[in-house]
């Protein structure tokens, strides 16, 4: 199976760690993508299409390819509408630290569920289909926890290291919220919370001023 992976070094490392030697893969950064790579691929995993919209046009060169696109900060329906794709297509959770897990977290359009099982069988991966919404499931919940942890520090209730330790010991989480934020990347956390706020209009996604301050300091 010829798999093309588009993303940065972290995405490549997570993909390789998850699938190991099960599948031969073409590992290209998003800046090296070209028509020949796309034409030769059976399956394309694009971790960065939302930040590189020009990719969407290139994929028309191979309408037979199965497109797997990182849709955490948007929806699959919105992407298909924008790019007019006719491929077999699925959205996946491609946030750093969330791809290399036992389950692929996927979204699909109406009528697309029938092919998901077949594709994941070829990939030799377990999967779960979630609703096609901004934030999917795991990213939405985790980023809300991170945001609330920043509010806790801002209010002076506890220090970061104490919150991380309490969450690990008290809830059996593998990492505390601040460690998770570093793994995911604060920019991703900020951008997802912002997208959730725009999508839902709900106050619970309001970004903590301390989180925003840290995010802006990194830019």
Language model feature labels by segment:
Residues 1-132, 160-219:
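NAD(P)-dependent Rossmann-like dehydrogenase/reductase catalytic/cofactor-binding core
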Residues 123-145, 149-152:
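Conserved anion/nucleotide-ligand pocket segment
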